[in-house]
């Protein structure tokens, strides 16, 4: 298996890290601190970092301030998505259905319709998308 790495960027000069490989450890508490301390979180109310990415699976750590949201994009071909709440709470809605999620709860969603998730308080979640 070929390992894949993310290169450092001006926003994350120490950001070189493995994204895919036989075994990829992910230090979630460290990444949470990192994305909450970056300028984009303070200026935009949200920030995210991809912590794993393979051909079929992407894991993204997302931090949201109260009232901020994440929503489906224009991507197609997603089969399943998981949203795990690490801190805070949020509401997830899709096609007239809404589900409240709090710390430690996991939502599995078959990607049939557009969705959005709105934070009720500062929130951190792990978003897994499977294609």
Where are these regions (language model features)?
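Glycine- and acidic-residue-biased ligand/ion/polar-headgroup-sensing regions
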Residues: 77-91
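Short beta-strand segments in beta-sandwich/barrel cores
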Residues: 69-71, 88-93
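A short, N-terminal "cap"/entry segment at the start of jelly-roll beta-barrel domains
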Residues: 1-56
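Ligand-binding loop in jelly-roll beta-barrel domains
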Residues: 111-131
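Conserved short histidine dyad/triad with adjacent acidic residue
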Residues: 43-48, 60-76
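A cytosolic small-molecule/anion-sensing beta-strand core signal
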Residues: 86-87, 102-103, 121
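Short acidic-glycine-tyrosine-enriched beta hairpin
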Residues: 95-111
